[in-house]
């Protein structure tokens, strides 16, 4: 029997002048209490500036997490200066997946760049590169039966791409559905799924309303 893997999924922490280190400290305690094997974050860790995270040494709180952290970028990482955001990810010990793939046992984590970058790679291109590197086998529509493919893509547009590329599970955020009125009406109109779970073919999806705003 294969050991199950416990994953904590987060999105949209928006750490900065509003959500401070003291807030994040409580979230870290909650996450550690779950005793996860892995932590995945679907973008927008940073709000609008890296400065308050540096001033409060928020990276130290990330180092208290008891499981490895993998994350993709969100649009706010671009608003806050993407090179500085990438530097913060490194200092915080976060493995950034930016149109790239990580393999952990039979689990394959694909992290897309945010669609703010109009030159980001297509999901099909990322998958093809992963196959060439041996991260994903060429069997059964791009993966073997014991592989599980997880996609992190901050903004939940074009959900059909994950299904078309054999993804097992996509995790997204961005919408903040239900957190601010009347944003929920707008997000329901903009996205095929603005919050919660969805299944398309063999692909399951979850769109998070996020931790902070």
Regions inferred by a protein language model and the residue ranges of each:
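Soluble catalytic domains of enzymes that build or remodel membrane lipids, polysaccharides, and related
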Residues: 2-213
């Amino acid at each position: 029997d294969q050991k199950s893997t416990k994953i904590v999924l987060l999105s949209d922490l928006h750490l900065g002048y509003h959500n401070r280190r003291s807030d994040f400290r409580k979230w870290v305690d909650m996450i550690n209490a779950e005793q996860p094997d892995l932590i995945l974050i679907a973008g927008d860790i940073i709000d609008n500036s890296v400065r308050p995270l540096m001033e409060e040494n928020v990276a130290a709180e990330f180092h208290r997490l008891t499981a490895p952290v993998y994350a993709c970028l969100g649009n706010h990482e671009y608003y806050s200066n993407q090179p500085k955001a990438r530097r913060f990810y490194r200092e915080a010990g976060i493995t950034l997946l930016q149109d790239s793939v990580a393999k952990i046992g039979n689990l394959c984590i694909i992290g897309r760049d945010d669609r703010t970058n109009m030159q980001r790679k297509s999901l099909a291109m990322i998958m093809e590169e992963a196959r060439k590197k041996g991260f994903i086998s060429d069997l059964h529509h791009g993966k073997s039966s014991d592989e599980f493919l997880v996609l992190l893509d901050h903004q939940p547009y074009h959900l059909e791409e994950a299904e078309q590329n054999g993804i097992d599970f996509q995790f997204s955020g961005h919408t903040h559905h239900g957190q601010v009125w009347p944003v929920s009406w707008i997000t329901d109109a903009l996205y095929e799924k603005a919050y919660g779970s969805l299944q398309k073919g063999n692909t399951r999806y979850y769109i998070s309303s996020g931790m902070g705003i």
